[in-house]
Amino acid sequence: MTEPRWKQRYRAPSLTLPRWAPDDPEHLVYVSNLSGSWQVHAWDRAADRHRQVSDHPTGVVAGGLTPDGTRVVWFEDSKGDEVGRWLQQPFEGGEAAPLVADAEPAWSAGLALGPKGLVAVGLATRDGFSVRVGEVGGGSEELYRHDEMVDVGGLSRDGRLLVVHHAEHGDNLHPALRAFELEPMAPLADLWDGEGFGLFVASAGFSPVAGDGRVAVLADRSGRLRPAIWDPAAGRRVDLELALPGEVDVADWWPDAEALLLVHTYMGRDELSRLDLRSGALERLDHRAGSIQRAGVRPDGA
């Protein structure tokens, strides 16, 4: 007897949008429940080869790639209580090892991967929140610690700058942003809209161009999430004025950093647009109506 189509639809395997390595876009990772639980998978697009990376009883939902595409990383908790460690493994397979050797088991408070094995990891324990910076597979150094919430936001393409969310002002729901220079491991700039307003690093994060320290952020001071471009080193913020009625996220940058891929959410539907940062022109992209969990721009601009 054939299973009803509605059951087939609910039981069909799901997967996240594959994420590619910036320096090797033929190496990708995604998370899928094909095996019966959510696990991280690696995809060698050139060889048309897929491989399940993680195999944890309670599942794994967070994974990524080092920028050069040589290593897969994922967060694995030992007991299903969300306390665990980031692990890493060669893209082709092999033994899994801690991403940062001296990072204690903790709740994850964000992760950012940079060039030449650079890693910034956020840790949350009963003793507070911290951010550690080090090398993949090696040791690390504590950059920041506080009793209030902190979460890693992103690393610049060249690894010079790190942005974190923090709640030093005591409001976890409305965080502020702080930028650090990683040489010499010191605060660079702060961005806060005041009490009751939050700032967040957008999905797109930093510009994909090395040497460009601009980061896409979201602000809610208008009553809806709206994008802005923050340049911590220059001390400059540009709020992007958009004639759109709903909330807007920045999904990605175009490879030359001259345009942004926007996701506009309104009336239960998501719409993709391309915003030219030079002219301000907003172009609606053609796609099917529905909800968009994630979108990206490939290195060739597709």
What are these regions (language model features)?
Residues 2-302:
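Peripheral, non-catalytic segments that deliver or gate enzyme domains
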